[in-house]
From Swiss-Prot:
Subunit (UniProt): Tetramer of two alpha and two beta chains.
Record organism: Rhodopseudomonas palustris (strain BisA53)
InterPro entries tied to this protein: Aldolase_TIM, RibuloseP-bd_barrel, Trp_synthase_alpha_AS, Trp_synthase_suA
Top EC class for this record: lyase
Entry superkingdom: Bacteria
Pathway the protein contributes to: Amino-acid biosynthesis; L-tryptophan biosynthesis; L-tryptophan from chorismate: step 5/5
Protein name: Tryptophan synthase alpha chain
């Protein structure tokens, strides 16, 4: 089974360049603006989109993404409405891979089986669930794969060669390498350390390796894209989004253009990396 993720990475490989992966929280700052933002991402140069599922206790998220989740929850965003957002996006874009990222609890409450049916029908391509280790694969990972979704696993600087095979066993789509330890948005990614880590992971898997956490500038994105199959940017986009809001935390006329402009400049960094590496 070839998924949208498989097709996108295959196309990018032919072009000799890395994927630019963007993250935004569903429903931030409201559902209408969230849809406009998602629609603007591919036009600005995003190859793959990660959509955050808002949750009340996001333990791996830094202040920017926590605040985004709170804004989304305040705007009434639920998992059901997140899937409706995906469905609305898919009306005009059937090619861009969409990956839902977040925590297991909202899916557990929704019900694993109905969630997987609804997610697949809406046009979701993959899941990144940060608080489900491989030991819990029977909970969601294996049913997700059976439903035709990619299950993307996180690897970190502390995931050693002994642990990696377990982490990678049921992973598909791509491997998400968290380049810095700690919460999102906290530190900058180091290109030489990333290069060594990507090489090490690739000894264990043929899957593409995307690198996230700590990428904030076009130069940083370019440096990572030289060594990885994809560069993921989230906190930097959420920061720009939050700075564009009014005093009440509502969207302004500047919100979508501000995010799209940053995406375009980061995309130029990622997409220019192939030429730098050749």
């Amino acid at each position: 089974m070839t998924t949208r993720l498989d097709s996108r990475f295959a196309d990018l490989k032919k072009q000799g360049r890395a994927a630019f992966v963007t993250f935004l929280m569903a429903g931030d700052p409201d559902l209408d603006t969230s849809l406009k933002l998602l629609q603007a991402l591919p036009k600005a140069g995003a190859d793959i989109i990660e959509i955050g599922m808002p949750f009340t206790d996001p333990m791996a998220d830094g202040p920017a993404i926590q605040a985004a989740g709170l804004r989304a929850l305040k705007a009434g965003t639920t998992l059901q409405k997140t899937l409706e957002l995906v469905r609305a996006f898919r009306k005009a874009d059937d090619a861009t891979p969409l990956v839902l990222m977040g925590y297991y609890n909202p899916i557990y409450i929704y019900g694993v089986e109905p969630f997987l049916i609804d997610a697949k029908a809406a046009g979701v391509d993959g899941l990144i669930i940060v608080d489900l280790p491989p030991e819990e694969d029977a909970e969601l990972c294996l049913p997700a794969i059976k439903a035709g979704l990619n299950f993307i696993r996180l690897a970190t600087p502390t995931t050693d060669d002994k642990r990696l095979p377990a982490v990678l066993a049921n992973t598909s789509g791509f491997v998400y390498y968290v380049s810095v330890t700690g919460i999102t948005g906290a530190a900058s990614a180091d290109a030489s350390a990333v290069s060594a880590a990507v090489t090490r992971i690739k000894r264990h898997t043929p899957l593409p390796v995307c690198v996230g956490f700590g990428i904030r500038t076009p130069e940083g994105a370019r440096d990572i894209a030289r060594h990885a199959d994809g560069a993921v940017v989230g906190s930097a986009l959420v920061d720009v989004l939050s700075r564009s809001l009014d005093a009440e935390g509502r969207a302004t006329a500047a919100t979508v253009p501000a995010v799209a402009d940053l995406v375009a400049s980061l995309a130029r960094g990622v997409h220019g990396a192939a030429q730098a590496a050749e």
